[in-house]
């Protein structure tokens, strides 16, 4: 190629829309979720020629949830693309959820032409201002030449440190403008090293001199890139541990003896009492958004070792004695495991033994249970039996989420996905769609209540169109029960929680999905098996009896439960 030809090629002109797509290709994006509109249709048009694949959703919020699932499962930003006005504003809940829960997402939206931005005109909105409080990065591109810089920085910022959402707005005339601006390359994020040696040595000393050191694994500690190192530490040092809801999957089958369940939302679990008895707590990748430290360090007297990529968010109940700041697996691997000797005295051994027994008892369906509807623990048990350890299960928010989060064992990272930062209704089905694209051909299970189901049930059409192998289980009781049982506890009555019943089987069939119903608890295993063996999307209606829900928020700590364990353990 001659010099003149090279210069001519370097001056090839493209629309801004094509430059946006070139940026996505450079970042390795495989899917873009969204809904088109006039202010952004130039980008959708360019995607037709260059990729990535467009996944048309039925609501922008759900498109953001799908992108969030991709971000959580891959560690790379999922991408959502929408138009101006309500197209952009409908992203708010999805981006807030992703940003709060540490999931990388890049959202791109159209806007009115620059000349109309300050006018009271159709769909004019200060997009960047709208998303500034709920994202890590929110900008509007005012010059076509800045597109590569804005998009590339959005990807970098969404993934860096505490991952989250980034937003870029494009006025219509900017994406339609022609330019010879070159793209910029994707720049890999710098990799952190381990924490400082002296901090690691000090942490080892505190653990070795503790009477009952406990590991609290948070969401970053339970992610695929950290899990091998975390499990190795737990196995070598034989420390008891608990998971937050979003760290589900830290547990492996050979760590069952050291595992004391998950903690979150209500302070009444075996893991809560374990932390109550601990004198040293090592937190790994823990974020206070998962479970406020005031619930597990109520007196503020625990010795806390904070191991994370970012500094601790200081709180009256969270003032670490040591901070091990660095790459999580590198820091853990830098610990000389064989040098850490932990031996529990008879008192502590008794505490652990009694807690294990209490934990086991709490996982059983009551012996005197009688109902023509399934007990929550029956559903959890049969679902666990129906799926292998690598099946991704996405969980909506509601009473069912508490039962799933506490009792559904997860043995691989990110195989139980839950929204515990914002507790956003409607995430399960869109997340399952995103997961099915990350893991093509693999069965995905999603779980919701009948309340949360209708927040995003329109995406069943998306699942059918994609022939996604999703089994969605609806725990059906015609009530916003997570609100109801808390109202009963506070006021001895409920208000504004009841709604009408729908025929979930017919709803599924109207979209071209398979609809199944569990008519009695003894059918659970067979119906779940039938659903797992079916082709394409399946919706299973499971009538549930939530009579035991009133105990979910019981105040067992620090009084009754604490006294019970005190008499047993001491």
Curated annotation (Swiss-Prot):
Write down the top EC class of this protein.
transferase
Q: Which cofactor does it need?
A: Mg(2+); thiamine diphosphate
Asked whether the keyword Metal-binding is assigned, the reply is yes
The pathway to which it is assigned is: Polyol metabolism; (R,R)-butane-2,3-diol biosynthesis; (R,R)-butane-2,3-diol from pyruvate: step 1/3
Listed under catalytic activity are: 2 pyruvate + H(+) = (2S)-2-acetolactate + CO2
Q: Which GO terms describe its molecular function?
A: acetolactate synthase activity; flavin adenine dinucleotide binding; magnesium ion binding; thiamine pyrophosphate binding
One term under GO cellular component: acetolactate synthase complex
Q: Which CDD domains match?
A: TPP_ALS, TPP_PYR_POX_like
Query: Which residues of this UniProt protein bind thiamine diphosphate?
Result: 60
Location of the region described as Thiamine pyrophosphate binding in the Swiss-Prot/TrEMBL record: 399-479
Question: Which EC number(s) are documented for this chain?
Answer: 2.2.1.6
Q: Which UniProt keywords apply?
A: Acetoin biosynthesis, FAD, Flavoprotein, Magnesium, Metal-binding, Thiamine pyrophosphate, Transferase
**What Gene3D superfamilies does the annotation carry?**
3.40.50.970, TPP-binding domain
In terms of superkingdom, the source organism counts as Bacteria
> What family classification does the UniProt entry report for this protein?
Belongs to the TPP enzyme family.
List the protein's name: Acetolactate synthase
Which species is this record about?
Bacillus subtilis (strain 168)
Instruction: Tell me the lineage of the source organism.
Output: Bacteria, Bacillati, Bacillota, Bacilli, Bacillales
Gene that specifies this protein:
alsS
